[in-house]
């Protein structure tokens, strides 16, 4: 029994170590010390440590490619990671939002919009967390702009901004609601 506990502890520690090393890679990107090519190679090396089909590893591969500007290569990894159903709520939201952003960049605007609306609708379900809610609204606003729907984009962006204003927040929220059909407040 103790041996089983030790193995489980070792697996948990290894997963935590992997997460820490992935976080360190992204910190080095923030400090601009890694090129896109080096980022992809580094993340791929770390992802190779995980089991084939590991959702977090596929997600990190997608992120690396997205950050490196090779969105077409990121798309499949995002889709595969999401399809497993094994991402935690935060990574799942990130994957949905980032896939939608990638699709927007690739010109697949309708699918980008559909993904973001589905993500935002999930946030409104009772008991569901709302990680990155405003971020999803921001990317949807960008998708609206790309679709030529600037009025709706402004409404969505202003509805996200309104609660943070020190003054005029009710007025801005009311006007924002007049510009867009749904704000996901």
Positions of the model-derived regions?
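N-terminal alpha-helical interaction modules that lie
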Residues: 1-56, 61-72, 85, 163, ...
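Alpha-helical linker/edge segments of TPR/alpha-solenoid repeat scaffolds
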Residues: 32-37, 72-73, 101-111, 142-153, ...
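Tetratricopeptide repeat
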Residues: 37-44, 75, 82, 113, ...
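Alpha-helical adaptor scaffolds
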Residues: 56-130
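"A position-specific structural signal for the A-helix of alpha-solenoid helical repeats
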Residues: 59-60, 98, 138-139, 174-175
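TPR/TPR-like (Sel1-like) alpha-helical repeat modules
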Residues: 117, 121, 145-167, 177
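Ankyrin-repeat and related helical/solenoid repeat scaffolds used for protein-protein interactions
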Residues: 121-153
